[in-house]
Structure formats: C-alpha cells, structure tokens
C-alpha cells in the first residue's frame, strides 16, 4: 500500500516513537519497571533531594499522575522534609540496585537504537530531535 504519510516528519516521528517505546517498555517490563518509573529514578539519582513537583515539570507529568507513579516506587525512593510543605526525594539502597539494572537495559537498548541509524546521521540525530522539543 502506498503511504503518503511517510512524507510528514510528525508522522515519521510518531511511528518511530511508538515502535521504540514499545520495544523499551517490553525490556523494562522484564525487570518489573516502566519507562516513567525509570525516568523518575534516573532524575532522582542525578538530583538527590529533588521535589515531586520539580520531577513532574521536568518530565511533563501532571501532579495527579505523579502521585500514583511515586506510590509505585515506594521502597525504591525515600522522602525527607525540606521545609514545612515540600519533601525531597532520594533513592534507597534497593532503588539504587533497581536503577542499576534498569540503566543496563536502557543503555543496551540505546546502543542498539543508535546502531540502526546510518553512521553519517548519528551525530545529528539528538540535536535535531532536541530542536523539536526545546
């Protein structure tokens, strides 16, 4: 079938995003984690003491969706009061262990993903994608 949609960058991006997200979700599911959970764990590891609201802003996740996401990570994250209202988040020892396993999955997946891109386009891929969402 002819597909005139392939001439639209937005369509191509959506197809690529759907295909790669499904593949990564399957791999992370094998270790009992979701992409959003791994993203949160990675950001907390890089920013100990970060608040849930700051995580939500960074990831584009509404507050109503952050609450259950953080609930699923109980035991992997710890909360510590920052002031009267805010709590900072940090990884627990089990959280660091799970993140290490997740990072191995993500890094292997990302290496395979970039290997699919022709060598002459690899250096331009991330800057081009970033230009679309920054």
What does each model-identified segment do?
Residues 13, 44-48:
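Short helix-to-turn junction characteristic of helix-turn-helix DNA-binding domains
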Residues 57:
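Alpha-helical residues within the helix-turn-helix
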Residues 62-65:
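Helix-turn-helix DNA-binding motif, specifically the short coil turn and the N-cap/start of the second
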Residues 40-41:
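Short alpha-helical "packing" element that flanks the helix-turn-helix/winged-helix DNA-binding module
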Residues 1-31, 88, 93, 97, ...:
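N-terminal leader segment of winged-helix/HTH proteins
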């Amino acid at each position: 079938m002819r597909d005139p949609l392939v001439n639209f960058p937005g369509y191509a991006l959506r197809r690529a995003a759907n295909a790669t997200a499904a593949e990564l979700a399957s791999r992370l599911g094998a270790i009992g984690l979701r992409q959003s959970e791994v993203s949160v764990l990675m950001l907390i590891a890089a920013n100990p003491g970060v608040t849930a609201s700051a995580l939500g802003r960074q990831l584009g996740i509404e507050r109503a969706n952050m609450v259950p996401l953080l609930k699923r990570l109980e035991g992997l994250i710890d909360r510590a009061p920052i002031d009267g209202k805010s709590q900072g988040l940090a990884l627990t020892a089990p959280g660091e262990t799970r993140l290490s396993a997740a990072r191995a999955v993500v890094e292997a997946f990302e290496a395979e993903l970039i290997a699919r891109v022709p060598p002459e386009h690899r250096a331009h891929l991330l800057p081009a994608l970033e230009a679309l969402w920054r």
